[in-house]
Amino acid sequence: MSGFLIANALLFLVVTAYAVYLFVYLVKTRLAYIRLGQKEQFDKRIKERLQAIWVNVFGQKKLLKDKKSGMIHVMFFYGFILVQFGAIDFIIKGLAPDRNLPLGPVYPAFTFFQEIVTFLILIAVGWAFYRRYIEKLVRLKRNFKAGLVLIFIGGLMLTVLLGNGMNLIWHEHGLSWSEPIASCIAFLLGGVGKTGAAVIFYIAWWVHLLFLLSFLVYVPQSKHAHLIAGPANVFFNRMESAGKLEKIDFTDETKESYGAGRIEDFRQSQLLDLYACVECGRCTNMCPATGTGKMLSPMDLILRLRDHLTEKGAAVTSRSPWVPAAAFRHTRGNQLAAASAGSGSQEAAAALDYNPSLIGDVITEEEIWACTTCRNCEDQCPVMNEHVDKIIDLRRYLVLTEGKMDSDAQRAMTSIERQGNPWGLNRKERENWRDAASDAEIPTVKEMKKEGKEFEYLFWVGSMGSYDNRSQKIAVSFAKLLNHAGVSFAILGNKEKNSGDTPRRLGNEFLFQELAEKNISEFEKNDVKKIVTIDPHAYNLFKNEYPDFGFEGEVYHHTEVLAELVKNGKLKPQHQLHETITFHDSCYLGRYNEVYDPPREILKAIPGVELIEMERNRETGMCCGAGGGLMWMEEETGNRINVARTEQALAVSPSVISSGCPYCLTMLGDGTKAKEAEDQVKTYDVAELLAQSVLGADMIMGERP
């Protein structure tokens, strides 16, 4: 027996060392691929980053947004960590028979706990199998790779239980309360005898070891690379405002192109995202583009970028992405690595011509322009991947380097550049919306200065509030409420320009920066300290992105200011409205800035209002379809996003659909028309509803467009 044990131990060391070598090689290979990306500065906010690890890795916060899948993963995650101690104990039993972890009197409790955890993991395996292959969740893939990990995990659990059962027979330990499942197995298979039990034990032991080491090698070259890349991605995730876009330095004369035209144009943190992807499909499941039949799928976009990075990385670094290399010699990645290294067959050498276009061959332009930048994908991602900034970088390359843009979007860009608004209306008519509110005091900054008066807030009206007839009524309602509450404010009037959100989200960074610099100059010239706006897109820009260009000031959304005025008693809702209202969360107000409560607090304060929530509300709320510059583009594929969102609102039978965004209100208003429900269901901004309740009949609400 001693000779067998020596041979067994030597073989164990050789096989384990080889598996560990392959694992280290694969991790270093993926790191080499990631390093092809653009370097970036790391802010070293270690404490906050460790807190993110604690909350999202160990706390599984984002995973638990989907309770069923989240609980399965929690069982896998903690179960797999805990059973590793049992695996060590099992390996010791194979290397030194009748030995175990030196836990003394605690050992029986340890084995009992291990068996319970092992049993729970087997339940989780069965549950996961059911969800994927029987319930057939649309967002989950059902290929061989998807099932392989269930085989690995299930095999690991079954072999350790079988091995422990045989160990009881082999060493005549007898049945034990501390190993209930192993004891059942020993009872059922007791007829095999000591020798038979020893043989079966070592078969189970080696199968368990091979499963474990195969899984170790499989992890870095599969979707389970997220076990390594996921925590790293959470740690290195941006600590600043969600969805904030990177500034392009146009003064850098060494740049030959802008945006991402090649995979290596992405930042290294963006490339880390690709290997962190869990392939859970939650992003795609929530995407408004995917849900309405568009070509874009956030998960598929990440996976195709990942596969392209792997192949490009193999060609550039000569490191084979798939090992053992002999088993994967026909894969494209390994052929590219062999060709790059100057070795391999003629077939491999031909693969060196690998040079697909990132935009066109890997990701289509149709996908790039389908994104509404709503960030529902990012909000759902359990490993904190960022999809939107990659799409914007692809748009930047198309617009700034290749000069490509949708014709309708280009028309809006030209109008913004020439007249400061997407319609191309006369810039000198920007303040004319005040004419419809002769009974309200809406001074310009110039008029206030002329009278020697000061103002607390600069009211940024925005292009929608200034030119769109329906949105002008929101601006008027808000202005009258500020007047009623005694809040001093002023507008820039004809000096106001477009905020730049549309150009930036459509990829025209140059125009955005030009507008931002001019707007900031105007703010500084007029000593602006506080800005309030009815436009969530401008709100997000001023609050989170303008500071990159030197802006310093407080920024508020109009619902934040109104909620505070109601709370302080300066605005008193007193007239009953008798409406059943459902509130639509603007993406740039909600997911980008987590402003969910103020508009709801306002609606709840209005007498006679019953507030009912849509199934998808707050952080899971669906986009109206206007974001990302799509307000100015036609939807040519699938169903209209605004109609889909309107259907969700109509499903709860409201009399009013409310919002805190002029873009959303326009899209939802069009949606009620498309569903022929405009006579039964009205669309109003929160400010309009509050004005009606505070001011009563003296305040005529805006009619539906």
Predicted regions: what they are:
Residues 2-127, 134, 265-274, 296-300, ...:
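Iron-sulfur-cluster electron-transfer modules
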Residues 14-21, 122, 154-158, 199-235:
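Alpha-helical membrane-embedded segments
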Residues 22-40, 93-96, 128-147, 162-177, ...:
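Juxtamembrane/interface segments at transmembrane-helix termini
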Residues 74-85, 149-171:
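Hydrophobic alpha-helical membrane-insertion segments
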Residues 94-109, 166-200:
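Membrane-interfacial helical/loop segments at transmembrane boundaries in membrane proteins
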Residues 243-299:
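Non-transmembrane accessory domains of multi-pass membrane transporters/channels
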Residues 277-283, 287, 301, 371-377, ...:
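Short cysteine clusters
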Residues 461-557, 588-605, 609-705:
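Cofactor-cradling patches in redox/metallo enzymes
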